[in-house]
From Swiss-Prot:
Coiled-coil spans in chain: 335-402, 517-576, 634-661
Listed Pfam families: DUF3490, Kinesin
Name of this chain's protein: Kinesin-like protein KIN-7I
Cross-link Glycyl lysine isopeptide (Lys-Gly) (interchain with G-Cter in ubiquitin) mapped to chain: K881
Positions of region (Disordered): 567-599, 628-671, 802-830
Domain of life: Eukaryota
Biased composition (Basic and acidic residues): 569-582, 634-652
Annotated source species: Arabidopsis thaliana
Amino acid sequence: MGGEEKILVSVRVRPLNEKEKTRNDRCDWECINDTTIICKFHNLPDKSSYTFDKVFGFECPTKQVYDDGAKEVALCVLSGINSSIFAYGQTSSGKTYTMSGITEFAMDDIFAYIDKHKQERKFTLKFSAMEIYNEAVRDLLCEDSSTPLRLLDDPERGTVVEKLREETLRDRSHLEELLSICETQRKIGETSLNEISSRSHQILRLTIESSSQQFSPESSATLAASVCFVDLAGSERASQTLSAGSRLKEGCHINRSLLTLGTVIRKLSKGKNGHIPYRDSKLTRILQNSLGGNARTAIICTMSPARSHLEQSRNTLLFATCAKEVTTNAQVNLVVSEKALVKQLQRELARMENELKNLGPASASSTSDFYALMLKQKEELIAKMEEQIHELKWQRDVAQSRVENLLKSTAEERSSSSSMDSRRRRISYDSTDFDEPRMLNNLGKSNLYSPDEDGFLLDDTTPQFPGHNLHDKWEEMAQSTTQEPEDACKEVRCIEVNSGEAERVQIQDSLDDIVEKKEYEQNYESQKDDADSSIKNIDMELSLYTKPEAEDGVSVKKLIEDVQETEQSVEKQKQSPKKEEMEQYLSRDMSEQVTKSLPEEEQCVQEYGAYDKLEAQDVLTINKLEESQQTEQSVEKEDTKKNLSSKKEDLKQNLSMDQSEQLYKSPPEDEKCVEVYEGSDKDDNTYEALKKKVKEMQKTIEYFMSIQSAEEKQSPSFNIIDDTLSPGEYFKMRRSRSCRENLLFTKAAAAAASRGFIFETTNTSFDSDITVSMDAQSIKDSDTETSSSSFHEFMAGLRERTMQHHSTHSDDTDTKTMKPENTDDGGEKTEFERQQSQIIELWQVCNVPLVHRTYFFLLFKGDPSDFVYMEVELRRLSFLKDSTETSRKQTAKAVTREREWLAKQIPNKFGKKEKEEVYKKWGVELSSKRRSLQVTHKLWNNNTKDIEHCKESASLIATLVGFVDSTLTPKEMFGLSLTPTTFNIKPSSGWKFSNSFSRISFTG
């Protein structure tokens, strides 16, 4: 019981007295309900309505005031909680009258409670009384009260009154006798407002201590609490009381102490954070616990309803309003003293001795026999339980040993079975390259769809590549895919095992056969769906080429026919000793121009126009699937075979229709492109000449395809795509790594740029995604006509310069002087150096990633075929140069992060001596700090004119990142990705390079 609670505030309004009635004084206050009082005088500046816990009107008797406003607080003293009851108000408002009745009713209830519970607890009541007269404390129970008492501070009890007499009550009559003495000793006087006016503050204190009659650890403590009945003297005005002399002096002391009480109440109502002036008055000092400490408090404010006391009544209500907000923290007071505990134990010991004496000898002997019998039974039970425990322990040990043996044997069996299984699988894998499920899986992935190519052309992702390099094993993959499915399935696992393990291996083989059969069925279903989707994709791609081309575009049909004628001429040399070598070289060369895998080779053949070869390969793919299906005899596989056959016929019809349509769609401008190679067709009949011509024709086809893609935005073929797909959807339409789709991506990017779409190029970032946006719409808004015409002029210039390059190269071939690709005349080399210098300067201005600079610098070294890529790079950097200042800061931050990452790679890539050589080479002192970071900050610095510095920077970065030799990677794989793309690098995902160099193989 106890805790924080607010003071219980009640207001009692007395009726008009005889003097007020004689003066015809009006009643201005009215109680509208049990909690609200209002003022009927409307000239008040402040509010006229007040709400309290309880409001008592004229007709309410003192008994009701006690029951509703003070009884609960007064009786909590019996539970060990301190309590206080105040009577506050102006002079002649009825304070003494109210407190006399409340004191009497409270004493009656307290003694009634004691009489009811005296069998359970022992109560001790102590009574003391004092008054504060002219700021002097007097003892009301002492006859000689002329000597004032001092106030002392006790660390346990707080403020105490020295030498205050405290009487222990015998009964109720004794209390009444003491109350009458207090009434006689209290100072009273007569004023003009009250004939019997109290001239002092009276405090009656009743202390109650209670302890349990029966001893127990829970009830050994003693409850000690006190209740205070405080009858305050009324505040008065000298002008109203007409006091003088001693009465005036008394009134001054009364008002001063009440003013201090009001100040304390007001500050307590606002919280206990500041200083509370308890010591400014002896009244507040004595009642400190009652006001804001360990006690429950009830205040009864009395007031007069007369208009003549209106201001005093309002002050009383304001005091009550503040007191209503004061919070006290009452706690139960437990007194656990050693003396009380010793006394309680002594009483309990005496009681038990008396009970023992009262027991007779007969009863004692019978009791001892009974206890002896019970003790014997308990001992027997304990012995029996010990035997059971011993037996259970033995059983537990046996069970544990069995479990351990079982676990050991199981582990040995698993290890032996796993070793046999791994050896058997190793023998099986050595005997054949593919089993049935893997054959179908590889067949589907090679000819129909490659999941590794998914997302290759996305504008915001980086493709994931396998760790191995497909260039080294291109011939092996080509040969493996051309094998017949029956040959791959003829291998049968033959495992010879020991006689002791034959049965286990046989069971394992049966399980493996079941698993492989299920995998075969699942792969078969997935490959059937992939075949359908692949055929649909082929139809869609072929349909794109059947659309009419733009007026100023070049014809691809003528070039396709040249490629076919060249291939036929190569086939005529089957009798030559170099036949096989030439076929392998052509296959490898075409694959290097586009991609690194078997499905990409087939897509490259589609792009270059070898439709007959494409048809043959697709038919071969379908035949492979049909032959692999013959190993299964189910009805479902037969149905699938029929579906694939129908797809094959549709594909053949579509291919033949497309070829027939394109015979009528060859513009006359194709002659200009074919003239480049006409002179060499008659003379170059050797193997080297044919190989060189095929290579040059492939590059020319690629160039004209890129030009066509840039201008295709006005052609019907591109309009079809543009009408059906939004720009954002068109970038995500296809995710293949084929040559055709690389060109389609370039086409879509150019068209979207002309229409005002936004391309995003994101520099490499190592702590956050930093995106630099090129808003083509802003360029279009500034000067739409100029932008469109400049783009066409740029593409026309590229086409004209490339024709010049090819014409020069054609003249060289007429003279049968074959120059290496990395050689050029003095004028072209000077032009290349000029473009290279401009690109390096723009790299520095645009904060291009260092890895991009390195690979571009190492890959493009001045070959005639590098001209287009140098122009595209210059065009891209010129767009980036116009980016905003915010984007420039973000890209600079990304380059700084890249340098920090490269600095971390130096200790991983070089040994101690090699690192010192690198530091010395780049002018970094060995005794300095953060030497690796100093080196990386010197890479690709502002010295853009120094080509040797650029070479050394590119060489070091290539070593740190782990670039493969640039000759093994086709330039088209890097050059075609120079269109604006988006790449993001996050700290959690490690390194992801941009699409400009994401197709490069890395080592280390």
